[in-house]
């Protein structure tokens, strides 16, 4: 219950920040922060090296493994903080903006905080005590959101999300340590470290490939179209992809740990995965429809015409958010079943596809080309990832075909109704509200018809189970 409530609150606060921040920050501010976070992400992957995944899976000698993992990650973090100066210098020269250097270095301090948070979080996941991990993490995120908004209103420009991120990490890490019985230890076993790196290296390579796929569009847009144009893309991506993706994160926050615990029981693994798939399909497409249909009302009615370049690419990216969620669910299942090499292959394939098609698409067609290239790449990779997960779990087309067919019918009907109603009104907050209500009404209504009245009943059961 606690995890679900916090996840919902976190999603709402994140959306609130995306409503407010464009009113006080410029596209250039968003672009600078997007690039800084991208380079910080590279450091974060190297510093983590899949250690959390290994800690959740390890069966014996956890205390020794945890101590070694902590020392290993702390040492890497210290080295990477020093390396962040060089990385920041490189970024500032590549993008011809000296303002990138210091934000990257400041964000890198968060690596130390993440080192101390890693083991307490893994301990909670191992015990399936998700609230012990979720409460500190969520409180930290809440603090980060409010700090970012307050700093933006106070005029801190692109520094607002930088300082907000560090504030959130500081609070979250402090609470994780305070609520955990585990305390940092400086024990280090070389043999254990080799085992961690052997498994974690594969996970890290997969994560790095996913990171390249996730941020190659940011890097390309910032380089070829400019940092300010990247700000438009950042907002479009936040609503088009992250909005629906946040829903999958609510499920994936717990699904990997649960699947890891039932990995030896194929029937239970299959059931857990199919349930997650059904719950996600019940809700995520509705969010995607809303963004695709109501992007003009959202951007022009809330942000104003200054942000209008974000509209079309936001609409193109709307389906990507749903696809990313399906890919995340499949990825968790494969990790839990001990098949990280499949994820490694698919992740690098995605990176290769996007690195190949995003630059020429962006150069030729601008932001629209970027969005279309990302949509194509993610579609191919999600299909492969879900296919591998289905094979590993023994799931046939017949198991998911009715769900997919009903979802497609519902999406088309609700999208058509929403477009018809919203097109009759000028772009405004009122049009956004009316359009949203129309889409939700038809979405729920069509699902009810297709399931003969079982959709809401099943949905309420899901919600009740999540909050019980």
Summary of predicted features, one role per range:
Residues 1-49, 77-88, 110, 140-149, ...:
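Signature of the first transmembrane helix
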Residues 1-11, 36, 45-89, 102-108, ...:
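Membrane-water interface segments that mark the loop-to-transmembrane alpha-helix transition
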Residues 15, 71-96, 102, 106, ...:
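Alpha-helical transmembrane segments of multi-pass membrane transport and lipid-handling proteins
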Residues 46-63, 125-126, 236, 240-284, ...:
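Helix-loop junctions and terminal segments of transmembrane helices
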Residues 54-63, 112-136, 154-159, 180, ...:
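Membrane-interface junctions at transmembrane-helix termini in multi-pass inner-membrane proteins
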Residues 101-108, 136-181, 198-200, 206, ...:
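Hydrophobic alpha-helical transmembrane segments
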Residues 131, 174-214, 219, 254-271, ...:
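Interhelical loop/hinge segments that connect adjacent transmembrane helices in multipass membrane
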Residues 395, 404, 418-468:
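Membrane-proximal transmembrane or re-entrant/amphipathic helices at the cytosolic face
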């Amino acid at each position: 219950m606690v995890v679900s409530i916090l996840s919902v609150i976190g999603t709402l606060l994140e959306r609130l920040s995306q409503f407010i921040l464009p009113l006080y920050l410029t596209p250039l501010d968003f672009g600078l922060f997007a690039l800084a976070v991208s380079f910080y992400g590279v450091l974060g992957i190297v510093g983590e090296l899949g250690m959390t995944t290994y800690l959740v899976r390890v069966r014996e000698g956890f205390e020794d493994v945890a101590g070694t993992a902590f020392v290993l990650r702390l040492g890497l973090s210290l080295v990477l903080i020093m390396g962040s100066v060089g990385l920041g210098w490189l970024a500032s020269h590549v993008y011809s903006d000296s303002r990138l250097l210091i934000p990257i270095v400041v964000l890198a301090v968060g690596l130390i905080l993440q080192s101390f948070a890693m083991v307490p979080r893994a301990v909670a996941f191992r015990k399936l005590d998700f609230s012990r991990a979720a409460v500190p993490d969520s409180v930290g995120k809440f603090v980060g959101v409010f700090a970012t908004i307050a700093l933006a209103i106070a005029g801190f420009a692109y520094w607002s999300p930088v300082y907000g991120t560090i504030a959130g990490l500081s609070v979250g890490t402090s609470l994780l340590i305070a609520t955990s019985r585990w305390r940092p230890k400086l024990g280090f076993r070389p043999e254990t470290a080799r085992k961690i790196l052997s498994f974690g290296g594969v996970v890290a390579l997969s994560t790095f490939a996913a990171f390249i796929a996730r941020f190659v569009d940011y890097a390309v847009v910032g380089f070829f179209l400019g940092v300010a144009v990247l700000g438009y893309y950042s907002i479009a991506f936040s609503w088009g992809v992250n909005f629906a993706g946040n829903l999958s994160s609510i499920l994936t926050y717990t699904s990997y740990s649960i699947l890891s615990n039932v990995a030896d029981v194929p029937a239970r693994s299959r059931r857990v995965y199919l349930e997650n798939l059904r719950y996600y399909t019940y809700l995520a497409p509705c969010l995607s429809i809303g963004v695709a249909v109501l992007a003009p009302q959202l951007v022009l009615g809330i942000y104003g015409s200054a942000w209008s370049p974000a509209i079309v690419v936001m609409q193109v990216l709307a389906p990507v958010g749903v696809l990313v969620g399906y890919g995340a669910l499949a990825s968790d299942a494969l990790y839990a079943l001990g098949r990280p090499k499949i994820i490694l292959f698919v992740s690098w394939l995605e990176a290769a596809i996007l690195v190949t098609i995003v630059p020429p698409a962006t150069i030729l067609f601008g932001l629209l080309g970027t969005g279309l290239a990302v949509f194509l790449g993610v579609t191919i990779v999600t299909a492969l990832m879900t296919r591998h997960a289905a094979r590993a779990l023994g799931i046939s087309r017949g198991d998911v075909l009715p769900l997919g067919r009903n979802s497609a019918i519902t999406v088309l009907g609700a999208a058509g109704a929403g477009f018809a109603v919203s097109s009759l009104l000028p772009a405004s907050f009122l049009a956004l509200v009316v359009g949203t209500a129309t889409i939700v009404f038809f979405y729920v209504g069509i699902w009810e018809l297709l399931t003969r009245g079982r959709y809401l009943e099943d949905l309420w059961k899901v919600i009740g189970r999540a909050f019980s």
